[in-house]
Amino acid sequence: MKYLIYLSLACSSIVVSAQEKSLQWQQVAAGVWKAVAGVPKKISPLSIANIQPNIEALSKLGKPAFPVNLQQSVNEIFDAKTLLRFPLEKEEQLFGLGLNFKSVQQRGTIKELQVDHYGGKDDGRTHAPVALYISDKGYGVLINAARRIKVYAGIAVRKDSKNPPEEMNRNTQSNWDPQPYSDAVEIVVPAPGTEIYVFAGSNALEVVQRYNLFCGGGVLPPKWGLGFTQRTPTLFSDKQVMEEVAAFESKGYPLSFIGLEPGWQTYSYPNNFVWDSTRFPQPQNFVRRLLDKNIRINLWINPYVSSRSPIYKNVLPYTGTHTVWAGVVPDLTLQPVQNLYKKLFLQQHLDIGVSGYKVDETDGYDVWLWPDGAKFPSGLGGEQMRQIYGLQFQKMSDQWFREKNQRTYGLTRASNAGSPSLPYVIYNDYYNHRDFI
């Protein structure tokens, strides 16, 4: 009898833990609702971006009702994962799910959303894998988790579906479909909790507007950020850069900012973040001469720290278990790390007139960056850190320029949800011109 009681308790525990629950939505702004499944981690893309919703502008867009077709959305915590399901209508179209190069319509696709170098496939591995899908029915769903989120966008079919596909005989029915009709978006978050946001609007454009405004609104770039730029070879000296500028002037070509590649530093890959005194003996004078011509300077960096960097010794206790190109990987979420970067970057760059950064290699490849099993002092694992690393550097550096009341406009290889208000654009090392067009 004792064993039967134990078995009964175990079975009831399984049933309760695996039971689907309706998502409970709370309105957080005009046309924006939030639900919580399980117990979310404190670190998420939106928390890293520290979004400040533009409540007034959101209200001006109107106050739409909660999307009726999402009222049947459910969640479940199972196998230490959060399972989410959102209904779809028969002809509903879906868009979004991060930066894609070859596809627009996403219904019928599977995406595993991970910050990574884009390798030629729209499979979710991309520079900005924002877990936001937009419906032509006038709503969008955002999953706010710093995880490798898997999305089955109208492709999975449950046996208890209220709108099941017709069973067909491939032997005799020529219209047999290898991908039967699916009436839901199913999402797997590899963590026992997440936040979910819904954005409503009269059309897809308004939904995107509402998402952008909820993240603080878009960026007003400096005029020079929209101008013509030129990046010089990695080992160019100050003299060679000035000769390049003179060549532009002699031909009457406009030039708004010059990008210096890794060789502006004494040591790169990993980096010391300090000007090379042989190629740039007087960096402040060099930057000033360019500013006098109304030309800005943008510096290439990646965040990985060489043992030859002035901050190496002090940052070492705040670094992860793994290295990148033998350089240590600081936990950028920690305040002491942010303070060390800020002090050095202000001294070496911003205080002498540098106007922005090109932030490289915060995306991938897997063979370059830390593994999922990496651990960081904040308690974040490798998977989580990879999802927010580029976003965190954007936020840090944006704050430096804001404190100087100076606009910046930079380039980044990695971003995520919450970034619309940050003054960076995506770039990459993917060179298939046809895919860009």
Residue ranges and their predicted role:
Residues M1-S22:
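Bacterial Sec-dependent N-terminal signal peptides
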Residues E20-I437:
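Catalytic-domain carbohydrate-binding cleft regions of carbohydrate-active enzymes
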